[in-house]
A protein has these predicted regions:
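Extracytoplasmic metal-acquisition and chelation regions
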Residues: 1-219
């Protein structure tokens, strides 16, 4: 359990994680808590709270590289005798992530400025990385009022989105129907699945495919 651990890696600004940190520190006074979000420029205003930091930092390859670096540094500091092992594994991971970032950049090269709709603003950092525009239907990560929803839908219409992302296991039938009413193609994604790399590639390919289709129709 946590009591027997030397390090605790926190993702960053996830609500339930922050709520638990006080108790964890109290019951495990010798535990070192490592903030994996250190060095990442957090996006503000998409979620509730004083500054509304977006907690979904892992939905970004560039953020993931920084998170891996933070973990590597903490491990080397805690266990310097195994630095060579940690360095070898870290370098392999960083190389893989750099290649994935290059692949995503290439897939989305012709889509800069393209917009997509999603209920919960979970793709903020992904959109930032590749010059996309996320139109979230929630307000600061919470259900929108009828008036707010009208504003969101107006914003979506003006942004001319190419796809509506449905989050598997989270979005209701009403959200699916809303996407249909907007005459947008829908793509189901699951950003918490183990196959993280495949999910990010699926998001990129969906945007690229719809950008290409729209460009073809306009010719």
């Amino acid at each position: 359990g946590v009591q027997k651990s030397d390090l605790f890696f926190r993702v960053g600004t996830i609500g339930f994680e922050q709520a638990a940190l006080g108790k964890i520190a109290e019951t495990s006074p010798g535990l070192k808590i490592v903030n994996c979000a250190a060095g990442i420029t957090l996006s503000e205003g998409t979620h509730g709270g004083p500054r509304g930091y977006d907690p979904h930092i892992w939905v970004s390859v560039r953020n993931a590289r920084q998170m891996a670096r933070n973990m590597y540094d903490a491990l080397v500091e805690e266990d310097p005798k195994d630095k060579n092992y940690f360095t070898e594994r870290y370098n392999a991971l960083d190389s893989e992530l750099a290649q994935l970032d290059s692949t995503l950049t290439a897939i989305l090269a012709s889509c800069r400025g393209a917009a997509f709709v999603i209920k919960h603003p979970s793709l903020t950092y992904f959109a930032r990385d590749y010059g996309l525009k996320q139109v979230a239907l929630e307000v600061q990560g919470k259900e929108a009022s009828p008036a707010q929803m009208r504003e969101r839908l107006d914003a979506a219409g003006k942004a001319a989105p190419v796809v509506f992302f449905i989050e598997k296991g989270h979005d209701s039938a009403a959200v699916v129907n809303l996407a249909k009413s907007m005459n947008l193609p829908t793509v189901e994604i699951s950003l918490l699945d183990y196959e993280w790399k495949d999910n990010l590639l699926a998001v990129a390919r969906a945007v690229a495919r719809q950008c290409a289709d729209r460009a073809g129709r306009s010719e």
